[in-house]
């Protein structure tokens, strides 16, 4: 319980300055709070790097920003109350009360989800070690720069995380709360889950302006990401940058951008730009992936109704301009990456790595249609409901569903578009665009249209469809795509979206009605499945490093020292202590000119064969860790700092 209180306090303190900035601008949304909080941290970190200072300066600057914004926030609250006319006050109260009721319900449900996530946190795994290592270095080093977080002493920046904004955010939470960074990464999702739910609701509210479909959209997002995969799904990784970008920052940016198409005020446009910048810094390609459906939305909105053209273009500019400025700074780093603008050998290697998700050959390819429905029953239902958006063409949600879906589907399914797109952003990233299909909104809006068409029959139909789809298409969540979703559902969505685009030209009132019960019953089987398998994932295995070894490295090895070990041990050592390493699994580090991860692995294999200490010394290592279970032949006449049944820590010296 104490740890939970610490984490809540830490996140609240770091988010508070952003909340005050957003309030000073008059934007009362969690989306704006998150966006401005990260922009404040971004500015504070940038100043810290320029001055080669420590995270103490970052924290002081973040808190100073909050103090500076507080008077303006109080003044803005008073002005808003004074300047409203009675008629506007009544109308605003009706809208605000409806929005607030839905947000309270979603926030409460998100809090319950967060507490449930505490029990399935399990162990750090996968990319978690990579990100945790960066947080450790930010907390430990006193002369920070953008290169301080590099895992290798002679390595370079990671193109996806060149500026460690989210890592800095987590490091500040750890510093303020006093919690161990490992606990922040493992249990941070408990605190972030309510925020994710509210942000999903705000994005739904911006599109629908009604409580029921907005709540349904938020619930569908949770079903797709947390319930369908079992074991908490990706929500257990909500403290990691990729998941945070997808489940927190992207809905925040979308909510603000859609609001800006309604009211393109300077405050909303600035907040949209702040969210876009934060998204671009935390996970660059996801900012680009947001532009694609948003442009599709604007084009369809233009074809169906013209009044939104100028506000829509302003909102798009707010999304693009700040992110593009960051991309200009990032471009030299991206240019050193093997997977961007790849040669023939690299493209063939990547194609073979993701072969199950691709159709075609290494020279021209697209994603397979099964990829769009791989997240299970809710995804399949959303694909089938998507065409019904054409019957509500006057609504913003319908334009976003049809336009966003067509934009994503065309890029992903047309080889002569998808191949150069993959060359530009890397195949590792481009295949993820399929996950940006607006499925949650398609389901939330489509079920309302279906309710208008078939009346009360929608309730048993929704329940039967939810059960049938969960049994037939439970989802395919492995790293390799084996079965995926039904291809026919994707083609129904493609054809239906085209038909919906044509149908939308007819000027007719939208066909839709509230469908709360039907929405709940459609999602219920997936929630039952998820909760029935609510256990820690076996994929995140216990840390093989012994507690004694970790304690010895933390106590004896200075921060920033270079430790040599096998790739798997090295990767984990950096996560538990602020040390540099010489080798890591190639799949978990950037394949850049400076990093050359595969060559490093080959060097370690030579060391394992020969025991030549010149190999670790060439990397600058002054400490050596040996896994005696895997490499019993490696024993050296060096000073032993720690020894247990499996691990030995040697002092290698200069």
Task: List PLM regions with ranges.
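Extracytoplasmic
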Residues: 9-12, 482-491, 506-654
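Membrane-helix boundary/interfacial segments in multi-pass membrane proteins
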Residues: 5, 54-59, 178, 229-245, ...
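Membrane-interface helix-loop junctions at the exits of transmembrane helices
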Residues: 42, 116-120, 141, 215-233, ...
């Amino acid at each position: 319980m104490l740890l939970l209180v610490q984490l809540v306090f830490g996140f609240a303190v770091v988010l508070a300055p952003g909340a005050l900035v957003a309030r000073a601008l008059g934007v009362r949304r969690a989306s704006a709070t998150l966006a401005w909080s990260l922009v404040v941290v971004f500015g504070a970190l940038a100043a810290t790097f320029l001055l080669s200072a420590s995270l103490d300066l970052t924290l002081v600057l973040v808190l100073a920003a909050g103090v500076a914004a507080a008077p303006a926030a109080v003044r803005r609250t008073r002005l808003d109350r004074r300047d409203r006319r009675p008629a506007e006050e009544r109308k605003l109260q009706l809208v605000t009360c409806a929005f607030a009721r839905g947000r309270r319900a979603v926030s409460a449900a998100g809090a319950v989800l967060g507490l449930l996530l505490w029990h399935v946190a399990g162990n750090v795994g996968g990319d978690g070690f990579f990100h945790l290592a960066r947080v450790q270095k930010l907390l430990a080093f006193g002369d920070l720069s953008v290169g301080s977080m590099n895992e290798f002493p002679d390595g370079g920046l990671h193109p996806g995380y060149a500026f460690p904004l989210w890592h800095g955010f987590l490091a500040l939470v750890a510093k303020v709360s006093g919690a161990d960074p490992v606990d922040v990464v493992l249990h941070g999702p408990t605190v972030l889950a309510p925020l994710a739910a509210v942000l999903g609701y705000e994005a739904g509210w911006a599109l629908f302006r009604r409580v029921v479909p907005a709540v349904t959209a938020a619930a569908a997002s949770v079903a797709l990401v947390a319930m369908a995969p079992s074991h908490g799904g990706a929500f257990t990784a909500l403290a990691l940058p990729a998941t945070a970008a997808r489940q927190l920052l992207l809905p925040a940016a979308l909510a603000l951008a859609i609001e800006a198409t309604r009211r393109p005020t300077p405050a909303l446009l600035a907040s949209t730009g702040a969210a876009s910048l934060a998204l671009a810094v935390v996970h660059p390609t996801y900012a680009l992936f947001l532009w694609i459906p948003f442009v599709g939305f604007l084009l369809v909105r233009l074809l169906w109704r013209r009044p939104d053209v100028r506000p829509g273009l302003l909102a798009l500019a707010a999304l693009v301009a700040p992110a593009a400025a960051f991309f200009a700074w990032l471009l030299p780093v991206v240019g050193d990456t093997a997977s961007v603008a790849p040669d023939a050998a690299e493209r063939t290697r990547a194609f073979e790595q993701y072969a199950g998700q691709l159709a075609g050959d290494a020279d021209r390819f697209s994603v397979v249609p099964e990829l769009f429905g791989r997240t299970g029953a809710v995804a399949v239902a959303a694909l089938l409901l998507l065409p019904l958006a054409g019957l509500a063409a006057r609504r913003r949600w319908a334009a976003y569903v049809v336009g966003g879906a067509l934009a994503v589907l065309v890029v992903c399914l047309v080889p002569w578009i998808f191949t150069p797109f993959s060359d530009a952003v890397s195949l590792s990233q481009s295949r993820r665009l399929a996950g940006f299909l607006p499925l949650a909104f398609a389901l939330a809006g489509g079920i309302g249209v279906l309710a208008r068409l078939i009346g009360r029959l929608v309730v048993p139909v929704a329940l039967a469809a939810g059960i049938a789809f969960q049994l037939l298409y439970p989802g395919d969540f492995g790293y390799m795509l084996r079965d995926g979703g039904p291809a026919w559902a994707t083609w129904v969505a493609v054809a239906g979206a085209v038909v919906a685009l044509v149908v939308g030209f007819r000027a007719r009132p939208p066909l839709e009605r509230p469908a709360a019960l039907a929405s709940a019953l459609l999602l219920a089987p997936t929630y039952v499945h998820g909760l029935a398998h609510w256990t820690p994932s076996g994929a995140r295995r216990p840390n093989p490093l012994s507690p004694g070894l970790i304690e010895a490295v933390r106590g004896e090895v200075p921060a920033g020292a270079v430790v040599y070990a096998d790739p798997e041990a090295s990767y984990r050592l950096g996560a538990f202590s602020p040390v540099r390493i010489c080798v890591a699994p190639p799949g978990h580090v950037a394949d850049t000119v400076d990093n050359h991860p595969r060559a490093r692995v080959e060097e370690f294999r030579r060391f394992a064969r020969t025991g030549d200490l010149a190999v670790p010394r060439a990397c600058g290592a002054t400490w050596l860790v040996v896994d005696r279970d895997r490499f019993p032949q490696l024993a050296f006449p060096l000073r032993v700092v720690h020894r247990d049944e499996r691990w030995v820590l040697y002092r290698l010296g200069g």
